[in-house]
C-alpha cells in the first residue's frame, strides 16, 4: 500500500491577500495598515489563516458591541456583598499599565507612585478609545443591524479601546465615536470625517504625507482636510500628553490621602470653600434630584465641622456615612464650578482646574474605598447607603468614576466596581417601591420619612433608567410593578437659602423630580419596547410611544413654564430635558429591515429636530439675543477680541471677602446656571458630554437633510434659520473650549461641526455648488487656524496658504516648514517648550500626607481679584 501524500503543516499567512496582490509590505494587522489607509477601503483577508491564528488576532472595532450581554441574576437580599449588578464592561480598567507603573524619570521631583486604588480612580481619566474609520464597508455593515447600531443620544459607544495603543494620538477624553457616524449621514462632509478619524490610527510621523497623498488621489468634488490638519492633530496629541503628565503628577501627590492612616478631613477643602461647593451642588444637581434632605444635611454639616474643630473623628456609622456623603457632594459641586472670567485660558488657571478635578476624583475614590471595606464586612443597605450609592451613580455620569461612559458590551464577563449597583433593584429590595401604609393619625416625622422614601425611590429609578438605556438592557421591573406614589411637589423640609436664586424665584427640587416621576412609567415601557426579548418592534408602535411620551413630557414642561408659576432655572430645564428626551430620540431611529417610507422618514426627522432643539435650547428665556453674534468666519475667533460667553462670565465660586449678595436679575441667574450646564456638556468624557455631541451631530445631519428636501420652503424658512443659529452657538461653545483647554479638548468637534454649520448655512442661502464648497473649506481652514492659535502655534508660520486651486502646490513648496513642525525629536513625544504648561508642583516635604493636605488648601484658595459671585449657604 503506497503511503499517502506527505502531511504539510498549514502556516499563517505572512501577508493579507490585498497586500500580496499589490506586492507591498503587510504589517499583519487585522486589518493591516495598508488596507486601512487605502481609499476606498479594501477587505483585509488572510486566506490561509488558521482558526487558532485568527482567534488570536485583535478584533476589529465594533465587534464586541453585537455580542449578547450576560443576564442579570435576581437577588433576594439587601446584603451588598451578594448584590448583582447590571452588565458593565470588562475593559473599565484599561490603561492601568500606563498609569501607576512606569513613572517618568525626568520629573523634577521624586514622586511616590500611587496606590492601586488611585490607579482605579484615574483609569477613566486616561482612557484611550479608538475612533474607527467610517468607510463604505462599515456603512454597509451598519445597515444590517438593529436600532442600537443607528445611534441616538445616550446610546452605547462603538469603539474598542484595546485596538490602538495609547501613544497613537487617540483622544482620551471623548468617550465615544457615535457622533462621527451620525454626522457621516451628511454625504458632503463624509470625507472630512474619514480624514480626521483615519489619523487616529495612523503613524504619527506620517500624518501629513498620508493626508497629502489622499488629497491628491481624490477627485476635485471631494471635500478633504487641508494639510494643516496633520499639524493640528500633532499639536493636539502633544497637548493631551502634557495634560496626562500633569494629571499623573497631581494624582500622585494626592495618593497618600487614600492610605488607611489618613483622616477624612485631610481630603476636605477649607470650610469656606466647602460651603461654596455644597451650595453649588444644591443649585445644580440638588435642584433636580432629591437625594439628600437639605435641612438635615445642613444641620449635620454644622455638627461635622464642630467635631473637626474639636479634633474628634467620626465614631458612629451615621457620622461616617455623612462624611462620605459630603466628600461626593463636594466632588459634584466642583464639577459645576467653572473658572473665573478671563482666566480660563491661562496656564496657571488650567493647572488649578486640573488639580481641582483630580481632587474630586480622589474624594469619590475615597468613598468607594470606604464602601468596599464596609461591604466586605457584610453591610446592609439603609437610607444612608442608598443615598451614597445615588451620589456615586451621579458622579459616574460626570466621569468622576472608573466606569467609562458610555458602557460597552462584552462577552468576557463583567467588571464589578464598588458602588455600581443597580439602584432600581436595590430600591425594590429595600421596599422603596411600595407605598407605605400610613393612617390618618400619622406623625409629622413619619410623613417626612415617607416623603423622603418616595423621593429616594424616584431618584434611584431615574438614575437606573439611563443605565438601562445606555447598556441596551430591559428594565428589571415593569411599568405597573410598583405602587410608590409620586413625590409631593411641595417640599416637606425647608429649602436652604441661596444667593443664586431668591426664594421668590425658586422652583423646589421636589417639583422637578415629581415631573420626572410622572414620565417614568412611560419610559419603562419604552425600554421594554426597545430591548425586551420578544417585544414588538414595529415602527407604528415606536411612533405611538414617541408621541405619547412627547405629549406627556411637553405637558410637564409647559406646567413648569406657566406664567402664573415660578420659573425654573436654566439648569433645571436642561437636566430635565437630558433625562427624558434621549428616550424619545431612541424611538425616532428607524428599525433596520423596515421598508423605507418617505413620509415616515420625514416625520422621524422632524421628531429628532424638535427634541434636539429642545435639548440645546431648553427654555424660552434662551430665545433672546445670542451671546455670540458671529457669522461663519467667526469660527476662527480671534482670541484678542473674543466675546465672553455665559460659560466664563458667571462662575459659581465667590471671593471670601465679598459680603454683598449678587444681583438677582434674570440675566445673571441664567448666566450662572448656563455656566454649570456648559461645564458638564462641553469637553470631557462624561455622559452629558457624550449626549451633547450626539445631539449636535444629529441636529447637523437632520437640518442639512431638511434643507436639501425643501418640502415646505415657505413654512420652514424661519425655523431653519433658527436651527442654523443654534448650531452656530454650539460651534462657538466648542471653539471656546478649544481655547480654554489650549487644544487638549474639542478640536475634532469644533472642526467638523463648523464644516457642517457652514454647509447648512450656505445651502440655506441657495448658494451654488462651488460657493458651498468654498464656504465649507473656508470654515474648516479658519477652524484649523484657530486651533493652532489656541495651542500656541501661529498657523502662518507653518503653512502660508489660502484655500484655492493652488493649495496642494503651495503645500509642496513649503514642505520643509511642515516637516519641521511635524517631526518629533524622539519617540517619547517630548513636548515642545511652547506647549509646556505651568507645573503646579509643591515643594517636596518629608510627610507626603501633609504635602497633599497643603495642596488641597492651595487649590481651593480664592484670590481677591477673582470676580466670583457672592454665594453662600446658612451653614
Curated annotation (Swiss-Prot):
InterPro entries: Fungal_TF_Env_Response, Transcription_factor_dom_fun, Zn2-C6_fun-type_DNA-bd_sf, Zn2Cys6_DnaBD. It is found in: Nucleus. Signal peptide: none annotated. GO terms for molecular function: DNA-binding transcription activator activity, RNA polymerase II-specific; RNA polymerase II cis-regulatory region sequence-specific DNA binding; zinc ion binding. GO terms for biological process: DNA-templated transcription. Residues 54-73, 136-172, 620-642 are annotated as: Disordered. Residues 16-44 bind DNA. Keywords: DNA-binding, Metal-binding, Nucleus, Transcription, Transcription regulation, Zinc. GO terms for cellular component: nucleus. Residues 153-168, 627-642 have a biased composition (Polar residues). Transcription factor that positively regulates the expression of the genes that mediate the biosynthesis of tenellin-type 2-pyridones, iron-chelating compounds involved in iron stress tolerance, competition with the natural competitor fungus Metarhizium robertsii and insect hosts infection. This is Transcription factor tenR.
Amino acid at each position: 500500500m503506497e503511503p499517502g501524500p506527505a502531511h504539510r503543516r498549514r502556516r499563517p499567512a505572512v501577508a493579507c491577500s490585498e497586500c500580496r496582490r499589490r506586492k507591498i509590505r503587510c504589517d499583519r494587522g487585522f486589518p493591516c495598515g495598508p488596507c486601512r489607509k487605502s481609499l476606498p477601503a479594501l477587505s483585509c483577508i488572510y486566506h490561509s489563516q488558521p482558526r487558532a491564528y485568527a482567534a488570536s488576532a485583535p478584533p476589529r472595532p465594533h465587534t464586541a458591541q453585537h455580542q449578547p450581554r450576560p443576564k442579570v441574576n435576581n437577588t433576594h437580599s439587601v446584603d451588598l456583598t451578594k448584590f448583582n449588578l447590571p452588565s458593565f464592561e470588562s475593559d473599565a480598567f484599561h490603561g492601568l499599565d500606563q498609569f501607576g507603573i512606569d513613572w517618568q524619570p525626568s520629573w523634577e521631583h521624586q514622586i511616590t507612585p500611587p496606590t492601586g486604588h488611585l490607579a482605579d480612580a484615574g483609569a477613566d481619566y486616561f482612557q484611550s478609545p479608538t475612533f474607527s474609520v467610517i468607510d463604505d464597508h462599515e456603512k454597509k455593515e451598519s445597515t444590517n443591524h438593529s436600532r442600537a447600531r443607528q445611534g441616538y443620544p445616550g446610546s452605547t459607544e462603538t469603539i474598542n479601546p484595546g485596538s490602538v495603543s495609547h501613544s497613537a494620538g487617540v483622544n482620551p477624553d471623548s468617550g465615544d465615536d457615535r457622533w462621527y457616524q451620525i454626522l457621516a449621514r451628511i454625504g458632503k462632509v463624509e470625507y472630512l470625517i474619514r480624514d480626521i478619524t483615519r489619523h487616529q490610527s495612523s503613524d504619527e510621523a506620517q500624518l501629513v504625507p498620508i493626508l497629502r497623498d489622499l488629497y491628491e488621489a481624490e477627485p476635485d468634488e471631494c471635500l478633504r482636510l487641508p494639510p494643516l490638519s496633520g499639524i493640528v492633530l500633532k499639536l493636539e496629541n502633544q497637548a493631551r500628553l502634557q495634560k496626562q503628565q500633569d494629571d499623573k503628577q497631581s494624582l500622585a501627590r494626592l495618593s497618600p490621602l487614600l492610605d488607611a492612616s489618613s483622616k477624612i478631613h485631610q481630603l476636605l477643602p477649607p470650610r469656606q470653600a466647602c460651603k461654596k461647593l455644597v451650595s453649588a451642588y444644591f443649585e445644580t444637581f440638588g435642584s433636580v434630584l432629591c437625594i439628600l434632605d437639605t435641612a438635615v444635611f445642613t444641620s449635620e454639616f454644622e455638627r461635622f465641622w464642630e467635631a473637626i474643630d474639636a479634633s474628634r473623628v467620626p465614631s458612629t456609622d451615621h457620622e461616617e456615612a455623612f462624611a462620605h456623603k459630603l466628600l461626593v457632594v463636594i466632588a459634584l459641586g466642583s464639577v459645576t464650578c467653572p473658572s473665573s472670567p478671563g482666566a480660563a485660558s491661562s496656564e496657571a488657571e488650567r493647572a488649578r482646574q486640573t488639580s481641582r478635578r483630580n481632587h474630586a476624583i480622589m474624594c469619590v475614590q475615597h468613598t468607594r474605598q470606604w464602601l468596599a471595606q464596609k461591604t466586605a464586612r457584610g453591610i446592609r443597605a439603609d437610607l444612608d447607603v442608598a443615598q451614597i450609592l445615588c451620589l456615586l451613580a451621579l458622579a459616574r455620569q460626570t466621569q468622576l468614576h472608573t466606569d467609562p461612559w458610555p458602557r460597552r458590551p462584552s462577552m468576557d464577563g463583567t467588571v464589578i466596581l464598588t458602588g455600581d449597583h443597580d439602584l432600581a433593584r436595590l430600591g425594590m429590595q429595600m421596599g422603596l417601591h411600595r407605598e407605605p401604609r400610613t393612617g390618618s393619625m400619622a406623625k409629622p416625622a413619619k410623613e417626612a420619612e415617607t416623603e423622603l422614601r418616595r423621593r429616594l425611590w424616584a431618584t434611584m429609578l431615574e438614575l437606573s433608567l439611563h443605565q438601562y438605556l445606555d447598556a441596551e438592557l430591559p428594565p428589571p421591573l415593569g411599568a405597573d410593578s410598583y405602587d410608590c406614589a409620586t413625590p409631593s411637589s411641595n417640599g416637606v423640609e425647608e429649602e436652604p437659602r441661596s444667593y443664586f436664586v431668591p426664594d421668590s424665584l425658586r422652583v423646589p427640587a421636589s417639583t422637578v423630580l415629581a415631573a420626572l416621576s410622572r414620565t417614568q412609567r412611560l419610559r419603562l415601557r419604552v425600554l421594554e419596547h426597545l430591548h425586551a426579548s420578544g417585544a414588538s418592534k414595529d415602527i407604528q408602535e415606536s411612533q405611538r410611544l414617541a408621541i405619547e411620551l412627547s405629549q406627556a413630557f411637553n405637558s410637564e414642561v409647559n406646567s413648569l413654564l406657566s406664567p402664573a408659576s415660578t420659573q425654573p432655572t436654566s439648569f433645571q430645564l436642561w437636566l430635565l430635558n437630558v433625562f427624558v428626551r434621549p428616550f424619545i430620540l431612541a424611538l425616532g431611529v428607524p428599525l433596520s429591515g423596515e421598508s423605507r417610507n418617505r413620509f415616515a422618514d420625514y416625520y422621524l426627522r422632524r421628531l429628532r429636530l424638535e427634541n434636539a432643539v429642545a435639548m440645546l435650547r431648553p427654555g424660552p428665556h434662551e430665545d433672546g439675543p445670542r451671546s455670540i453674534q458671529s457669522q461663519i468666519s467667526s469660527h476662527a475667533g480671534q482670541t484678542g477680541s473674543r466675546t465672553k460667553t455665559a460659560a466664563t462670565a458667571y462662575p459659581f465660586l465667590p471671593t471670601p471677602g465679598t459680603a454683598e449678595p449678587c444681583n438677582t436679575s434674570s440675566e445673571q441667574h441664567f448666566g450662572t446656571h448656563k455656566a454649570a450646564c456648559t461645564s458638564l456638556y462641553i469637553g470631557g468624557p462624561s455622559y452629558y458630554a457624550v449626549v451633547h455631541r450626539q445631539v449636535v451631530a444629529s441636529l447637523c445631519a437632520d437640518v442639512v437633510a431638511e434643507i436639501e428636501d425643501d418640502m415646505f420652503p415657505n413654512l420652514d424658512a424661519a425655523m431653519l434659520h433658527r436651527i442654523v443659529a443654534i448650531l452656530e452657538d454650539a460651534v462657538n461653545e466648542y471653539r471656546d473650549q478649544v481655547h480654554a483647554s489650549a487644544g487638549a479638548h474639542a478640536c475634532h468637534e469644533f472642526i467638523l461641526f463648523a464644516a457642517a454649520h457652514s454647509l447648512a448655512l450656505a445651502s440655506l442661502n441657495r448658494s451654488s455648488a462651488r460657493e458651498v464648497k468654498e464656504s465649507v473649506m473656508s470654515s474648516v481652514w479658519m477652524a484649523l487656524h484657530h486651533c493652532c492659535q489656541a495651542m500656541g502655534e501661529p498657523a502662518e508660520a507653518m503653512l502660508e496658504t489660502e484655500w484655492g486651486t493652488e493649495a496642494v502646490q503651495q503645500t509642496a513648496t513649503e514642505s520643509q516648514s511642515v516637516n519641521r513642525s511635524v517631526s518629533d525629536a524622539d519617540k517619547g513625544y517630548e513636548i515642545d517648550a511652547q506647549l509646556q504648561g505651568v507645573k503646579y508642583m509643591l515643594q517636596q516635604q518629608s510627610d507626603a500626607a501633609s504635602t497633599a493636605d497643603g495642596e488641597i488648601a492651595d487649590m481651593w484658595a480664592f484670590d481677591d481679584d477673582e470676580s466670583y459671585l457672592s454665594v453662600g449657604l446658612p451653614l
